[in-house]
Amino acid sequence: TLPPPSEWAFHLDLWQNPYAVSRYYNVEPFSKEHFDLMRPLMKLYADAGGKVITASIMHKPWNGQTYDAFESMVTWLKKADGTWYFDYTVFDKWVEFMIDLGVKKQISCYSMVPWRLSFQYFDQASNSFKFLEAKPGEAAYEEFWINMLQDFAKHLKAKGWFDITHIAMD
């Protein structure tokens, strides 16, 4: 007799794309209806021994590689005064949902180095979405990510998820 999947040593990491489910069923992403539709699908992953939660912390980390784009589960907002604000509401809902299903060994957050090196944020001063084009090593890239990572680390520690969270790349 096999032990429950939560006790399996095998590290199963299959990417999940909740945005594909919302598009397929034409429901609002991360609404109650969306979670109800995802529950049996993600339960299959958990029951197969899935250990890793796939989270996208930026807009389209893989450009257009997948039919359904991975949107950001974190809202990046540059305030009118130039400071940054990050809203983790969607990220938290998604992670809590997956943990409740039993997927709780690791959270893989994609990605600091996306294919296009283009980073979307909402600019409060212009009331519009903007894109920062920057490469690792450039001052703009470092400023952009340092603000987010410091805030993200604080948030993850408050939620008790810091030790299981990884910044992932593809």
Where do the model's predicted regions map?
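Aromatic-lined carbohydrate-binding surfaces of glycoside hydrolases
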Residues: 1-170
